[in-house]
């Protein structure tokens, strides 16, 4: 139960609070953010959430874009996002010390611009994790001291586009066996280990069974705090053997003018650590527009807390979580598959090396390589095989209602 002051307490603290850490969701300044920077109004964007942020010993943000000019975008399915290098001012104005770069957009303008993004952020005093000059560097945790604690932060994303390879810059891919071993090793020497992941299904208010299993595995491997992001909407929270898991806090600042629903709503989770680990989360719900991020107040704030509890309730019920994902897949799986297949040109098999053919097949490539896309198509095809699509879809109206709550 989330208290009216936003405190989600898992247990009583032992020896008082030793360390506070907040992680913000997706930030992509887009053109509106660039305008704020150009007009010298960066601090104003965060003014109303600054007191909450400033109480933390460590502030981390999910940075969802390269910092570059829009030249030479890579071939990919999906949009190539960018923000001008000057937009790093927003991260600095928010007081963020760390930027998470393992996501599906960091590499949108190629390896050189990814490395430039790291450099631009570093020059603003913002350390980065989740991307690097090659796979080994991208996978490395960021180790730092904050609040008198030695912290190791890991950051991994799904296999979309722009992931690092042995000899190529990119973001750190989710390679669970390698990643979990690294977290377990770090847990033996660091005071706190944070596993920050990027993956899942956009606009789905619930994580998939695979995402939930993966996040729980990081908790079991020794992570003190597990954070996931990507859905562009709030998802729930659970407490796994002493480790909180935030499945998605929603966007923090992503001012696309044509997005409705829950796109502009989210929450800041602040983890409160005692000597044993995290004993509570402080949750600050907010809404944003192009100009400012504003905490929710009054009945809207309370309604958000009850909504987050609704999203969290089924997380300990595997059968229910399977039903929810089957419902989602029953409505969206066919679209993923149909769009990808529709772009494949006739006779492609005679010219597989043709660049036009390669570009046309990028969507299909993403279905096979991106874990979340693979999940949804595989689930849809299994439902089709078992003649259960209509049965699974009966639960979808409930999910649609959650996508458009009355308070939003």
Regions found by a protein language model. Give the residues of each.
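A short C-terminal boundary segment appended to hydrolase-like catalytic domains
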Residues: 15, 268-408
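Active-site environment of divalent metal-dependent phosphoester hydrolases
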Residues: 30-32, 67-70, 104-118, 135-140, ...
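Short acidic, glycine-rich surface-loop motifs adjacent to enzyme active sites
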Residues: 56-68, 103-104, 184-206
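Binuclear metal-dependent hydrolase catalytic cores centered on His/Asp/Glu-rich metal-binding motifs
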Residues: 32-47, 81-82, 143-193, 213, ...
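Conserved beta-sheet core of the metallophosphoesterase superfamily
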Residues: 96-98, 209-269
